[in-house]
């Protein structure tokens, strides 16, 4: 019962879509209506509002971090922490508050990894930054970081074995790659948008939806 309750709370925390909330508060178009239609920081950046994108990034990462931190703060066993990690991540992917139309989980996964172990989170984030800096593709950076996260985990803690948190990290990585399957096709076809690209639809949407709740 304790694990179920912790996972439920984590899922609800993850279901808060900061991309949608921040955009609404700042009078911007719903990020699900333009660009990649993904409610995440990279797509919010396409609106041209860097502040909104940063707030989205921080908010999505924070909810992943706080869910796992709380689980450990209250002394829950590793199996509960693992389920909390997966639940908050799934909450972001399929948020109950937003008709289950969620993001791809990059920032939330980063927050989870930082809470699991700061070095694990920082190593994965650094991997994302390096790939993003050289190639300017957020999706490619996310895919590479997702592949390397379990590898970093093995280097830090050894093979997963009976460590449920390590298996949770692996599960999140697999889910994150699966959520980027459309991006993989675009990358292979040379049609993927680069970081910082602004969509005319975003600007038009912002002008039309500005001031709406």
From Swiss-Prot:
Catalyzes the transfer of an acyl group from acyl-phosphate (acyl-PO(4)) to glycerol-3-phosphate (G3P) to form lysophosphatidic acid (LPA). This enzyme utilizes acyl-phosphate as fatty acyl donor, but not acyl-CoA or acyl-ACP. GO terms for molecular function: acyl-phosphate glycerol-3-phosphate acyltransferase activity. Its main location: membrane. This is Glycerol-3-phosphate acyltransferase. The chain crosses the membrane at residues 3-23, 51-71, 78-98, 115-135, 140-160. Pfam families: G3P_acyltransf. It catalyses: an acyl phosphate + sn-glycerol 3-phosphate = a 1-acyl-sn-glycero-3-phosphate + phosphate. PANTHER family: GLYCEROL-3-PHOSPHATE ACYLTRANSFERASE-RELATED, INNER MEMBRANE PROTEIN YGIH. One of its GO terms (biological process) is phospholipid biosynthetic process. It is an enzyme of class 2 (transferase). Pathway: Lipid metabolism; phospholipid metabolism. Keywords: Cell inner membrane, Cell membrane, Lipid biosynthesis, Lipid metabolism, Membrane, Phospholipid biosynthesis, Phospholipid metabolism, Transferase, Transmembrane, Transmembrane helix. It is found in: Cell inner membrane. Probably interacts with PlsX. One of its GO terms (cellular component) is plasma membrane. It is a multi-pass membrane protein. It comes from Burkholderia cenocepacia (strain ATCC BAA-245 / DSM 16553 / LMG 16656 / NCTC 13227 / J2315 / CF5610). Belongs to the PlsY family. Its EC number is 2.3.1.275. InterPro entries: G3P_acylTferase_PlsY.
């Amino acid at each position: 019962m304790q694990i179920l309750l912790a996972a439920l709370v984590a899922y609800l925390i993850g279901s808060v879509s900061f991309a949608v909330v921040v955009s609404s508060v700042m009078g911007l178009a719903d990020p699900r209506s333009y660009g990649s239609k993904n409610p995440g920081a990279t797509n919010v950046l396409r609106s041209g509002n860097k502040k909104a994108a940063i707030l989205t990034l921080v908010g999505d990462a924070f909810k992943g971090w706080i869910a796992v931190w709380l689980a450990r703060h209250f002394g829950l066993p590793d199996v509960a922490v693992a389920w909390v990690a997966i639940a908050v991540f799934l909450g972001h992917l399929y948020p109950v508050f937003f008709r289950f139309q969620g993001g791809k989980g990059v920032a939330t996964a980063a927050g989870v990894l930082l809470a699991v172990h700061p070095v694990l989170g920082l190593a994965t984030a650094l991997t994302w930054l390096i790939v993003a800096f050289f190639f300017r593709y957020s999706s490619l950076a996310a895919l590479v970081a997702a592949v390397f996260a379990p590898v970093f985990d093995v280097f830090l803690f050894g093979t997963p074995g009976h460590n449920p948190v390590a298996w949770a990290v692996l599960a999140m990585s697999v889910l994150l790659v699966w959520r980027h399957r459309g991006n993989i096709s675009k990358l292979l076809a040379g049609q993927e948008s680069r970081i910082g690209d602004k969509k005319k639809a975003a600007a038009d949407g912002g002008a039309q939806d500005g001031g709406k709740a």
